[in-house]
Design a protein with these regions (language model features):
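Glycine-centered tight-turn and secondary-structure capping sites
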Residues: 65-69
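RNA-contacting regions in translation and RNA-metabolism proteins
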Residues: 1-60, 74-96
């Protein structure tokens, strides 16, 4: 390996994979809603996996869920796929 090349880990020791997944979920949700300041995520690491609860303004909950649940289904699919990559199950819920 050349002296000018460095190998770095993309996650710090303090940051859990579930935190990185939650950051991505928050980024997606903030892009969907009108009131970004009302968006908050509660991440709970459980024995069986991770639960990410999305709280947003009541008027924006429909935008996060989407017509026939398409938006939240897509968000769940992305979060679960990332969770599988790190060996964890991830569930996403909207509290509205």
């Amino acid at each position: 390996m050349a002296a000018d090349q460095q190998v770095t880990d993309s996650t710090t020791e303090e940051e859990l994979p579930s935190d990185r997944i939650a950051d991505l979920v928050e980024l997606i949700v903030c892009g969907l809603v009108d009131d970004e300041d009302s968006v908050s995520l509660d991440v709970t690491d459980r024995e069986g996996g991770t639960l990410i609860e999305i709280e947003c303004a009541e008027a924006d909950a429909g935008k996060v869920i989407g017509r026939h649940g398409r938006q939240i289904k897509a968000i769940r699919t992305i979060a679960r796929a990332l969770g599988q990559r790190v060996g964890s199950s991830v569930d996403v819920e909207v509290l509205g």
